[in-house]
UniProtKB/Swiss-Prot annotation:
Name assigned to this protein: Small ribosomal subunit biogenesis GTPase RsgA
The protein's enzyme class: hydrolase
Family per similarity comment: Belongs to the TRAFAC class YlqF/YawG GTPase family. RsgA subfamily.
Gene Ontology terms, MF aspect: GTP binding; GTPase activity; metal ion binding; rRNA binding
GO biological process, one term: ribosomal small subunit biogenesis
Cofactor note: Binds 1 zinc ion per subunit.
Organism: Prochlorococcus marinus (strain NATL2A)
């Protein structure tokens, strides 16, 4: 069988399929050189030790795991342990994420400020750096593009505008993604996430779908999370699209999830320490900020929700 039961190698979970884990390991770590045809990184179909289930250890895409009992020829192994996570994104469930790239369409489907903010808050809640990728910029004018960039800048976020039709911005995006270890590509359905991955990594060829003319939104093409190599040791996760991420946060912490609010709160202090930035006297938050109405609406939902600190 050519199994090496004594060897334990580290790998990363790149996909979950039924009850199996797909784990990628580096061939340079192999002690058995009978299979040198497997040059570079290979993927193993793995089961998990039952003790992991007994210990209540869940394993998700992005987790760093130990594999043993490796069958090199048939590319199978057993996951025996999982390392502590550096970060975790709950939806979609991905471990050890270093960047959340949120794909937002400039047109088709139309830009939705609330929807975009909810995706940004998902990253902020997990304390993971967000990046906005503005797709389909070939459908808008240069003036509209400038308005988008300035909008996101006023929110406190970087934006990389791209088009897969004329490749504008693609080189800049690849350069940025290769500077971080694991990027999750998130966003609503129909904004072109999967098409963008196909453009960034031509060997992948993932299925895509068009935006519904009746509903004015995309349909779900990606059904599960999977990691793909994008060069320089960096990985990119394609994730299922969903259109309304929930916000789960304590009301007292909510304002600190908005970079434009954090800037004002770092420069000045509200009169009251427990200020929620509603109508309290001495509040330093500018009520004319573009996203303040969104903040206020969702804050009220959190306070009045029967579920603990949830809006939407």
């Amino acid at each position: 069988m050519n199994k090496n039961k004594s060897n334990k190698l580290k790998g990363i979970v790149v996909a979950l399929k039924a009850n199996f884990l797909i784990v990628e390991i580096d061939h340079k770590n192999f002690k058995d050189h009978s299979f040198d045809q497997f040059y570079g990184k290979i993927r193993l179909l793995c089961i998990r030790r039952s003790k992991l289930n007994y210990q209540g250890l869940f394993i998700d895409v992005g987790d760093i795991v130990c594999v043993e009992s490796i069958d090199y020829k048939n590319k199978r192994a057993v996951v025996s342990d999982v390392e502590p996570r550096q970060s975790f994104l709950k939806r979609p469930a991905v471990a050890n994420v270093t960047l959340v790239s949120i794909c937002i369409s400039a047109d088709e489907p139309l830009f939705d400020m609330e929807q975009t903010s909810r995706f940004l808050l998902t990253a902020e809640c997990a304390n993971i750096e967000p990046l906005i990728i503005l797709t389909k910029i070939d459908l808008i004018t240069k003036n509209d593009l400038i308005l988008y960039i300035n909008k996101f800048k006023s929110w406190g976020y970087d934006c990389i505008p791209v088009s897969i039709h004329n490749s504008q911005g693609i080189d800049s995006l690849i350069e940025r993604l290769r500077k971080t270890k694991l990027t999750v590509l998130a966003g609503p359905s129909g904004v072109g996430k999967t098409s963008l991955i196909n453009h960034l990594i031509p060997t992948v060829s993932l299925p895509t779908s068009s935006v519904s003319k009746k509903l004015k939104r995309g349909t779900h093409t990606t059904r599960h999370v999977e990691l793909f190599a994008i060069g320089n040791g960096s990985l990119l996760a394609d994730t299922p699209g969903f259109n309304r991420p929930e916000i789960v946060c304590e009301p007292s912490d909510f304002a600190f999830l908005f970079p434009e609010f954090r800037t004002q709160l770092s420069n000045s202090q509200c009169k009251f320490r427990n200020c929620l930035h509603r109508d309290e006297p001495g509040c330093v938050i500018d009520k004319d900020l573009e996203r303040y109405p969104f903040y206020r609406q969702n804050l009220e939902e959190m306070i009045n929700s029967p579920l603990p600190y949830q809006a939407g």
